[in-house]
Swiss-Prot record:
PANTHER family: MULTIDRUG RESISTANCE PROTEIN MDTC, PTHR32063
Any GO molecular function: xenobiotic transmembrane transporter activity
Localisation: Cell inner membrane
Alphabetized UniProt keyword annotations: Cell inner membrane, Cell membrane, Membrane, Transmembrane, Transmembrane helix, Transport
Naturally occurring in which organism (per UniProt): Escherichia coli (strain ATCC 8739 / DSM 1576 / NBRC 3972 / NCIMB 8545 / WDCM 00012 / Crooks)
This protein's name: Multidrug resistance protein MdtC
Membrane topology note: Multi-pass membrane protein
Keyword Cell inner membrane (UniProt): yes
NCBIfam families reported for this sequence: PRK10614.1, RND_permease_2
Length: 1025
């Protein structure tokens, strides 16, 4: 009593306390960062290594394996995958959540150093690492186009000047430049001219290398002067290499231009990038795992004007894709939903109390509680994101509940004629414990979430803490500011005013009277109610088992990613044509705003596309509907497939795949893996629960298999090293020299001119100069035949791996797909040597599925413990928790009605319902116990009176919570796919629980009371005997 009086009779101190809370919240709000979701990125580091011309199998055995053995010893590595393709190896290291990315990077560098002695000596550079996940969609894509500059010049400018500058911006993890390669002098050899002149390819390589040398020459000086010596030992352009003498034939000089075409070109001609229909260089910017996407994008945008000033006028720099507009739009939608929720909740209070003065009180207490929460969010290092703002939206219904319970009870005393200050003190004292019980038991629901590990725990922690803090501040405000305002603002009702009931008030009285009559009938038919309660429990179990489930709602971020997979024997020129064809189909779709794409590099049969959709208010279809429409058009393109998926804010794992979900096959027997992967992939492709099934196992690439006749080679004076050097010189785009420039280093690349390699007959023109100086054709000592070879070799850990990727068709859930895959694997009878498991997001979904029921049980158990401590009873908490089955049924039925799968967001809704619906029972039980203790009433009379007295606040709190969640259900626009499952779950659960718990709670109360009495009598009878 003294605690409440302290605030009621000291209004200035109470107002200033509330002002202080509000000011702290405003300051916190201004400093909070903005993000789409809480920080849930796994620390990921990518290690890259190259050995130009090496086959995928060679890269895997000689480069990937030594690095993997060394990197696998690093502490905190949760997953290690690698992919080796022509001349390139990528190793992706995913670390535990609590691993510091900078410390991990130091360990990675140390592991690379330790493995250096085991790597091939011919590698042009040491392996490097980047602190970015290559499977993440870029947060921004910049494009460079020009009508006058070549693609190589644009690439040089982008990689030399733009990329390093952007990489230095806080939050940027990686800037990947694509669409071409660095400028280079290319030497395109003419095999017939070489043969005629008796010049070997090694002669050309040695001559070029020796003619371009950068060595210190020293200095001259006398007594007074010093001269630095400088020579023309470097050749920098194709024109300078053209007259280079490489050989003498019969006394005549053979120049490089006589046997080759020398051009200023690019290092790798098998690269192409486009934006819409125009050739372009792409700068794909990815953020660090711990960086804030909005702050990083804003920093890049702030730097762009400065970069524009350094760009020549003939180069056009444009932002082709930016993830931030849809994120900002989504957050604006949530903020609008929050404002609407507050307005609706206050409207509910006004309708019930029919008093402007009374309505002002929650209109002040609710904003104070919500705004004050921002201060705690800032201190906890949180951000303004979809989940934390949704927590505040839902908290609107919770924080007003506390104020409603106090306000309604004080208003009831005022209606009875009590003076305002006395009514405020008495009313607050009566419900103080009730409000405390409601708040603490609600916070208790979230304790298991706070202790939950992994990605789901990290994802839900901000939601749980934000909501708990809002409830805690609401508890303080409702026991201090609310009663003070009631005591000083409200007036005692006059007798004639008490009788004046109109409109909603008259309807509420009629509802209360009807409820009283129906409650009497129910209390006389308790067995029927018991059957209904048991039925809801059984229905809960059946609905939870049968409802489709997924990990996280499929988001429409306005950005699509596309992976092109063409025939494994396709040429680069044909692949570039496929890229252009696919881009045209997509560009012609009315919902598409911008398209960028690239192909080439180590995998000539693959490419990537990034598609920006028009804003949601300019298109009527969702991203998934657009994908479904495009899928039909894209399927008509022969010889290649384009797999589209919507970019998501949550993506787990470092695998680069062409679809959203992955299923990985592992084996220590590579032959078994290559035998079973096609069988499994073809089986999965027939399942209606899966779409866009594809695999990263590509072992049918065209290969020309050369078999050396070693006896003949020995007789002709040729060794294997000379033969291999011939092939590398001719077809490996071999880098034979380096050109040093002030801003960068460029290569001299040698290969047979592509004009002479259009078919297999090019091998017949190759020759080796033996130890007698004779030209020996390759066909004299080697035979060749076409064969199949892998385009890539993949590992997970130290095992061979193949990852099958898939998307979900419209109307199918991840649980449907998972169950279908498990059935298919059982039907196929896959041997134990080939192990299958879900990866990435699908793996996290499997882990979350296993822990969901445990989490719900833990939340119920925690609430029971808290209520048991508060009521000093084993029985009364069970009465209060009997409200939960009806809420669960309502929530699951609502999800089924809206065709929404049970996701992590729906799980949050179930957890919230555990906290919400028990409030009705708490108010009933509190007043029933009070009536029994002080009113000398029987249990049935006490619970009946409690139900009628608390009918109005029960209706007010339920409607407040319902109207607080209703805007989430009805909201559209950006991010609605995240908000709607939460709103649907809460609204469905509240409606069903309100209909049932008004009757089941009194019956359960009486049942446990009789049970308590029965057990309490038995010991007494035993003692008497």
């Amino acid at each position: 009593m003294k605690f409440f009086a302290l605030f009621i009779y000291r209004p200035v101190a109470t107002i200033l306390l509330s002002v202080a809370i509000t000011l702290c919240g405003i300051l916190g709000f201004r400093m909070l960062p903005v993000a789409p979701l809480p920080q849930v990125d796994f620390p990921v580091i990518m290690v890259s290594a190259s050995l130009p011309g090496a086959s995928p199998e060679t890269m895997a055995s000689s480069v990937a394996t030594p690095l993997e053995r060394s990197l696998g010893r690093i502490a905190g590595v949760s997953e290690m995958t690698s992919s080796s393709s022509l001349g390139s190896t990528r190793i992706i290291l995913q670390f535990d959540f609590d691993r510091d990315i900078n410390g991990a990077a130091r360990d990675v560098q140390a592991a690379i150093n330790a493995a250096q002695s085991l790597l091939p000596s011919g590698m042009p550079s040491r392996p490097t690492y980047r602190k970015a996940n290559p499977s993440d969609a870029p947060i921004m894509i910049l494009t460079l186009t020009s009508d006058t500059y070549s693609q190589g010049e644009l690439y040089d400018f982008a990689s030399t000047q733009l990329a390093p500058t952007i990489s230095q911006i806080d939050g940027v993890g990686d800037v990947d430049v694509g669409g071409s390669s660095l400028p280079a002098v290319r030497v395109g050899l003419n095999p017939q001219a070489l043969f005629n002149q008796g010049v070997s390819l090694d002669d050309v390589r040695t001559a070029v290398s020796n003619a371009n040398v950068r060595k210190p020459q020293g200095a001259l000086e006398d007594g007074t002067h010093r001269w630095q010596i400088q020579t023309n030992d470097e050749l920098k352009t194709a024109a300078e290499y053209q007259p280079l003498i490489i050989h003498y034939n019969n006394g005549g000089a053979v120049r490089l231009g006589d046997v080759a075409t020398v051009t200023d070109s690019v290092q790798d001609v098998r690269n192409a990038g486009m934006t819409n229909a125009k050739p372009a260089i792409l700068l794909m910017i990815r953020k660090l795992p711990e960086a804030n996407i909005i702050q990083t994008v804003d920093s890049i945008r702030a730097k762009l004007p400065e970069l524009q000033e350094t760009i020549p006028a003939a180069i056009d720099l444009q932002i082709a894709q930016d993830r931030s507009p849809t994120i900002r739009a989504s957050l604006e939608e949530v903020e609008q939903t929050l404002i609407i929720s507050v307005a609706l909740v206050i409207l509910v209070v006004f309708l019930f109390l029919r008093s402007g003065r009374a309505t002002i009180i929650p209109a002040v207490s609710v904003p104070v509680s919500l705004i004050g929460t921002f201060a705690a969010m800032y201190l906890c290092g949180f951000s303004l994101n979809n989940l934390s703002l949704m927590a505040l939206t839902i908290a609107t219904g919770f924080v007003v509940d506390d104020a409603i319970v106090v306000l309604e009870n004080i208003a009831r005393h005022l209606e009875a004629g009590m003076k305002p200050l006395q009514a405020a003190l008495q009313g607050t004292r009566e419900v103080g414990f009730t409000v405390l019980s409601m708040s603490l038991s609600l916070v208790a629901v979230f304790l298991p979430l706070l202790l939950m590990g992994g990605l789901p725990g990290r994802l839900l922690r901000e939601f749980a803490v934000t909501l708990s803090v809002a409830i805690g501040i609401s508890l303080l405000v409702s026991l201090t500011l609310t009663p003070m305002m009631c005591g000083w603002m409200l007036k005692a009702s006059k007798p004639r005013e008490q009788k004046r009931l109109r409109g909603f008030g008259r309807m509420l009285v009629a509802l209360q009277q009807g409820y009283g009559k129906s409650l009497k009938w129910v209390l006389n038919h308790t067995r029927l109610v018991g059957v209904v309660l048991l039925g809801t429990i059984a229905l809960n179990i059946w609905l939870y088992i049968s409802i489709p489930k997924t990990f996280f709602p499929e988001q429409d971020t306005g950005v699509l990613m596309g992976g092109i997979q063409a025939d494994q024997s396709i040429s680069f020129q044909a692949m570039r044509g496929k890229l252009q064809d696919f881009m045209k189909i997509i560009r012609d779709d009315p919902a598409v705003d911008n398209v960028t794409g690239f192909t080439g590099g180590s995998r000539v049969n693959s490419g990537m596309m990034f598609i920006t959709l028009k804003p949601r208010d300019e298109r009527s279809e969702t991203a998934q509907q657009i994908i479904d429409r495009l899928r039909v058009k894209l399927a008509k393109e022969p010889g290649a497939n384009l797999f589209l998926m919507a970019v998501q804010d949550i993506r787990v794992g470092g695998r680069q795949s062409n679809a959203s979900y992955q299923y990985t096959l592992l084996s220590d027997d590579l032959a078994a893996l290559r035998e079973w992967e096609p069988k499994i992939r073809k089986k999965l492709a027939t399942l209606p629960e899966l779409a866009d099934v594809n695999s990263d196992q590509q072992d049918n690439g065209a290969e020309m298999n050369l078999v050396y006749d070693r006896d003949t080679m020995a007789r002709l004076g040729i060794d294997v090293q000379a033969a291999n050097s011939l092939l590398n010189n001719a077809f490996g785009q071999r880098q034979i020299s380096t050109i040093y420039q002030p801003m960068n280093q460029y290569k001299v690349v040698m290969e047979v001119d592509p004009r002479y390699t259009q078919d297999i007959s090019a091998l017949e023109k190759m020759f080796v100069i033996n130890n007698e100086g004779k030209a020996i054709p390759l066909s004299y000592f080697a035979k060749w035949q076409p064969a199949n070879a892998p385009l890539s070799v993949n590992h997970q850990g130290l095992s061979a791996a193949s990852t099958i990727s898939f998307n979900l068709p419209t109307g199918k859930s991840l649980s449907d797909a998972s169950a279908a895959i498990d059935r298919a694997m059982t039907q196929l009878g896959v041997p134990s040597t080939v192990r299958g498991s879900f990866a990435g997001t699908a793996q996290v979904f499997q882990e979350t599925m296993n822990s969901q029921v445990i989490l719900i049980i833990a939340a119920i158990a925690t609430v029971y413990i808290v209520l048991g401590i508060l009521y000093e009873s084993y029985v009364h908490p069970l009465t209060i928790l009997s409200t939960l089955p009806s809420a669960g049924v309502g929530a699951l039925l609502a999800l089924e009605l809206f065709n929404a799968p049970f996701s992590l967001i729906a799980l949050i809704g179930i957890m919230l319902l555990i906290g919400i619906v028990k409030k009705n029972a708490i108010m009933m039980v509190d007043f029933a116990l009070e009536a029994q203790r002080h009113g000398n009433l029987t249990p049935q009379e006490a619970i009946f009176q409690a139900c009628l007295l608390r009918f109005r606040p029960i209706m007010m709190t339920t409607l407040a919570a319902l109207f607080g969640a209703l805007p989430l259900v009805l909201s559209g626009g950006d991010g609605s796919e995240l908000r709607q499952p939460l709103g649907i779950t809460i609204v469905g659960g509240l409606v069903m629980s309100q209909l049932l718990t008004l009757y089941t709670t009194p019956v359960v109360y009486l049942f446990f009371d009789r049970l308590r009495l029965r057990f309490s009598r038995k010991p007494k009878q035993t003692v008497t005997e």
